[in-house]
C-alpha cells in the first residue's frame, strides 16, 4: 500500500499550485457587467437584487457602487450613471468607487442590460465559493487546535458548512429602527390575514386561538407523566402541520419505531381502531378506508426518524439538511430524556439542561418551532387532584426557563377509572412567553390514537 493510499501524501495533483496564498474565487468581468446592466436599466436592478447582496462582490468598490444603486432604487429614484455619481458624491464615496469615469466604464462593458441577471448569478456563485473556502479554513483551524469536546467541534463544523448556503447572513446586532421595522411589518402582515393564524397550526382550535399557532424560533415543551398520551399529542401536531397544511415536519422518535408511528397515524386519520390494526381484525370496510387514507396522506411532507441512540449532533445535522432540501417548518422530538449527548457529563441534570438550551438555539437558527416532549416527575401523583405543575419538569429547571410555551397534559381518567371526565383531557398551557396561560379542554379518543377538539355543546 502506498503512502497516498493511507492518506499521508501531500494530496495535491502534479503541477497544482503549491503557493500558500491563492486569490479567492471571483469574476471581475461578471461583477462589472452586472453593475453595468444595473446602471442601464431599472429592470436589471430588479433582476440582480434577487440573487446578489453587496457583500457578494469581491472588489470593494463594486460593493460601494451596488449599495448606492440599491439606495436610489429603494427610494424610486433613477439608477443611471448621473444619479449614482451624484449619490456617491453626497456620501463622500465617489473616489472610493473609482470615480465618475469608472461608472461610465461599467456601462460601456455591456451592450445591453438584458443579461444582468445571468451575470449576477455568476457573482453569487463565486461569493458562495469564497464562503466555502472561508468555512473550510475555519474548520481546518478548529481541527488542528482541537479545543473542547470532539462532538462539539463536529457540530461547529456542521454549522460552518450550513452557514455557507443556509439562511441569509445577518449582523450580530441591529439598530432599534431595524428591529421596529420588522415588528411593524409583522403587525401589518397579521392585519392583512384578517385574524387568521400566523404560526404553524396545532390542529386544536382553542389552543391555536390562544397561541396563534406555533411560531418560528419557539421551543415548545409538551410534558406529562408516562402513558398519558404525550406521543399521541405530538403526532396530532405533526398531522395538523404536515397532512392538513402541507408544512414539512420531522418527527424524531426515540421511543417508538416507524411502523408503530405509521400505524397510529393511519388509525387517527382513517378513524379505524388502533387495536384492530394491531390484531389484524380489520374488516373489508376498514380496509377500504385505510387504503383511501393511505392515498390521501402518502405525499404529506412528514419525515420520521426512529434511529436508536440519537445524539443531539445528529438531530441538528438532519434538521439543517431538511431545512435546505425541503424548507423544514417544524421539528418534534419524542422525548427529551431519551436523548444522548455522546460524551461524558457530570450529571444527567446538566446533560438535559444542555439539550434544552441547544434545542432552543436550533429553533432560532432554523427559524422553526421545535416541540420537545418531556417526562414529569412523580409530583402530580403525590397531590390530591393529580394536577401537574411546572415544578414537576423532570431532571432540569432549565427546561422551563428555555421554553417559550409549556403544555402540561393531564387526564383525570388515567387516575380514576370511573371518573365522569372519561374521554376528556386537559392541555394546561402553564407557560406562554408571548401571551396568556389557559387550560384547554380536548377530547381523548384513545381507540383511534388521537386527541381532538371537544364537540360543540
From Swiss-Prot:
The SF4 helicase domain covers: 193-457
Q: Which InterPro entries match?
A: DNA_heli_DnaB-like_N_sf (IPR036185), DNA_helicase_DnaB (IPR007692), DNA_helicase_DnaB-like_C (IPR007694), DNA_helicase_DnaB-like_N (IPR007693), DNA_helicase_N/primase_C (IPR016136), P-loop_NTPase (IPR027417)
Q: Which residues bind ATP?
A: 224-231
Q: Which reaction does it catalyse?
A: Couples ATP hydrolysis with the unwinding of duplex DNA at the replication fork by translocating in the 5'-3' direction. This creates two antiparallel DNA single strands (ssDNA). The leading ssDNA polymer is the template for DNA polymerase III holoenzyme which synthesizes a continuous strand; ATP + H2O = ADP + phosphate + H(+)
Q: What class of enzyme is it?
A: isomerase
| Region called Disordered, residue ranges | 1-26
* Any single biological process term in GO: DNA replication, synthesis of primer
EC number of this enzyme: 5.6.2.3
Q: Does the keyword Cell membrane apply?
A: no
A GO molecular function assigned to this protein is: ATP hydrolysis activity
List keywords of the entry alphabetically: ATP-binding, DNA replication, DNA-binding, Helicase, Hydrolase, Isomerase, Nucleotide-binding, Primosome
Q: What Gene3D superfamilies does this protein map onto?
A: DNAb Helicase, Chain A, P-loop containing nucleotide triphosphate hydrolases
Show the ranges annotated as biased composition (Basic and acidic residues): 10-26
Q: Which domain of life is it from?
A: Bacteria
How is this protein annotated for GO cellular component?
cytosol; primosome complex
- State its role: The main replicative DNA helicase, it participates in initiation and elongation during chromosome replication. Travels ahead of the DNA replisome, separating dsDNA into templates for DNA synthesis. A processive ATP-dependent 5'-3' DNA helicase it has DNA-dependent ATPase activity.
Assembly: Homohexamer.
Q: Which family does it belong to?
A: Belongs to the helicase family. DnaB subfamily.
What is the protein's name according to its record?
Answer: Replicative DNA helicase DnaB
Q: Which organism is it from?
A: Leifsonia xyli subsp. xyli (strain CTCB07)
Amino acid at each position: 500500500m502506498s503512502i497516498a493510499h493511507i492518506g499521508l501524501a501531500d494530496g495535491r495533483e502534479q503541477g497544482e499550485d503549491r503557493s500558500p496564498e491563492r486569490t479567492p474565487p471571483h469574476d471581475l468581468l461578471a461583477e462589472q457587467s452586472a453593475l453595468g446592466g444595473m446602471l442601464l436599466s431599472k429592470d436589471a436592478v430588479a433582476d440582480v437584487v434577487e440573487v446578489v447582496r453587496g457583500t457578494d462582490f469581491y472588489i470593494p468598490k463594486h460593493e460601494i457602487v451596488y449599495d448606492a444603486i440599491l439606495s436610489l432604487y429603494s427610494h424610486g429614484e433613477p439608477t443611471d450613471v448621473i444619479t449614482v455619481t451624484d449619490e456617491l458624491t453626497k456620501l463622500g464615496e465617489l473616489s472610493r468607487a473609482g470615480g465618475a469615469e469608472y461608472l461610465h466604464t461599467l456601462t460601456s462593458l455591456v451592450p445591453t442590460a438584458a443579461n444582468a441577471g445571468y451575470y449576477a448569478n455568476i457573482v453569487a456563485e463565486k461569493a458562495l465559493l469564497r464562503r466555502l473556502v472561508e468555512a473550510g479554513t475555519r474548520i481546518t483551524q478548529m481541527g488542528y487546535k482541537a479545543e473542547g469536546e470532539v462532538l462539539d467541534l463536529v457540530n461547529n463544523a456542521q454549522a460552518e458548512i450550513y452557514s455557507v448556503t443556509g439562511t441569509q447572513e445577518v449582523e450580530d446586532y441591529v439598530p432599534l429602527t431595524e428591529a421596529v421595522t420588522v415588528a411593524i411589518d409583522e403587525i401589518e402582515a397579521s392585519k392583512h390575514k384578517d385574524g387568521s393564524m400566523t404560526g404553524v397550526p396545532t390542529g386544536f382550535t382553542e389552543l391555536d386561538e390562544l397561541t396563534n399557532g406555533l411560531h418560528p424560533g419557539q421551543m415548545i415543551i409538551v410534558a406529562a407523566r408516562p402513558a398519558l398520551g404525550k406521543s399521541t399529542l405530538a403526532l396530532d401536531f405533526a398531522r395538523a402541520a404536515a397532512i392538513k397544511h402541507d408544512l414539512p415536519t420531522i418527527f424524531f422518535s426515540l421511543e417508538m419505531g416507524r411502523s408503530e408511528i405509521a400505524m397510529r397515524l393511519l388509525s387517527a386519520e382513517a378513524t379505524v381502531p388502533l387495536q384492530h390494526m394491531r390484531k389484524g381484525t380489520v374488516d373489508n370496510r376498514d380496509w377500504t378506508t385505510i387504503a383511501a387514507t393511505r392515498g390521501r396522506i402518502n405525499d404529506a411532507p412528514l419525515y420520521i426518524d426512529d434511529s436508536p441512540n440519537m445524539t443531539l449532533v445528529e438531530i441538528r445535522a438532519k434538521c439543517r439538511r431538511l431545512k435546505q432540501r425541503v424548507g423544514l417548518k417544524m421539528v418534534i422530538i419524542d422525548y427529551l430524556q431519551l436523548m444522548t449527548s455522546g460524551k461524558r457529563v457530570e450529571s444527567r441534570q446538566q446533560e438535559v439542561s444542555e439539550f434544552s438550551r441547544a434545542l432552543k438555539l436550533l429553533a432560532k437558527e432554523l427559524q422553526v418551532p421545535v416541540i420537545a416532549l418531556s417526562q414529569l416527575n412523580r409530583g402530580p401523583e403525590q397531590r390530591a387532584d393529580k394536577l401537574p405543575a411546572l415544578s414537576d419538569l423532570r431532571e432540569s429547571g432549565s427546561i422551563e426557563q428555555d421554553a417559550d410555551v409549556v403544555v402540561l397534559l393531564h387526564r383525570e381518567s388515567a387516575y380514576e377509572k370511573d371518573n365522569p371526565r372519561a374521554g376528556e383531557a386537559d392541555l394546561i398551557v402553564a407557560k406562554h412567553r408571548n401571551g396568556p396561560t389557559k387550560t384547554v379542554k380536548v377530547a381523548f379518543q384513545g381507540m383511534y390514537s388521537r386527541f381532538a377538539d371537544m364537540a360543540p355543546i
